[in-house]
Structure formats: structure tokens, C-alpha cells
């Protein structure tokens, strides 16, 4: 499955103006892939992962990563591939940003300026993995 990265980025940037990183990343990927799930269900699935888990901006994993991991699971049919991709998604993000922790990336939620770029970066990685 080939995902159009330009459309993917546009969707994520649009959603990120009013949704969380986990919601924006999951929805951008699933919509670009035409995955059959409603926006409402994607938001319900992803909303608890916002702000490093429940909006705590604490030690929880960045929502861009959790959104990407959820999309990876939906867009792949093979469980071993999903697990291998998950490890690659996690490690790629950590290598790029030095951490996967929301609190470290956002200064405990005080600076969300890196968020949209984090979402786009990791969503494009998922697109590459899905295209394999």
C-alpha cells in the first residue's frame, strides 16, 4: 500500500490545530490509507494517549508515537510485522528526538511547538514501513 506523504502531512497539520498528537497521527495515517474506521472511533481510540497519557505531560510516551503504533497495527495484517515495525517506529523516533517521553519533548506541556513536526516525522516512517 502506497501512502501519499504530501496528503498525509497536510491531514496531520490540519488535525493538529485542534486535536492531540495521538489523534492527529492515527487519523492522518488511517485516512490517507483509506482504512475503514470512523473519525469518531479513531478519536475515542487515541484520545487517552494524548499529552503523554491522559494529558499528564509526565513520563508517558509521546502521542505521536502511540498514534503511529496504533495505525501500524491497523494498517498491517501480519502480527510479527506489526511487532517488528513497532520496534523500528519507537527506535527511529527516539533516535531523532533523543526520547519518546512527552514531558521531555514539550517541557512538561509548556512548549508544544515541536509536536506537529514529531507527528509528521513518525507518520512518514509508518508510511515507509507500510509501503515495504
Regions found by a protein language model. Name each.
Residues 59-67:
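Membrane-inserting effector segments that mediate pore formation, membrane fusion
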Residues 8-16, 50-59, 107-111:
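A short glycine/serine-rich beta->alpha loop
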Residues 7-35:
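Active-site-proximal helix-loop elements at catalytic-domain edges
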Residues 66-75:
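DPxDG-like acidic metal-binding loop motif
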Residues 33-44, 74-88:
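Phosphate-handling active-site elements
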Residues 21, 62, 102:
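Short cysteine clusters
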Residues 2-3, 82-132:
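C-terminal binding/interaction regions
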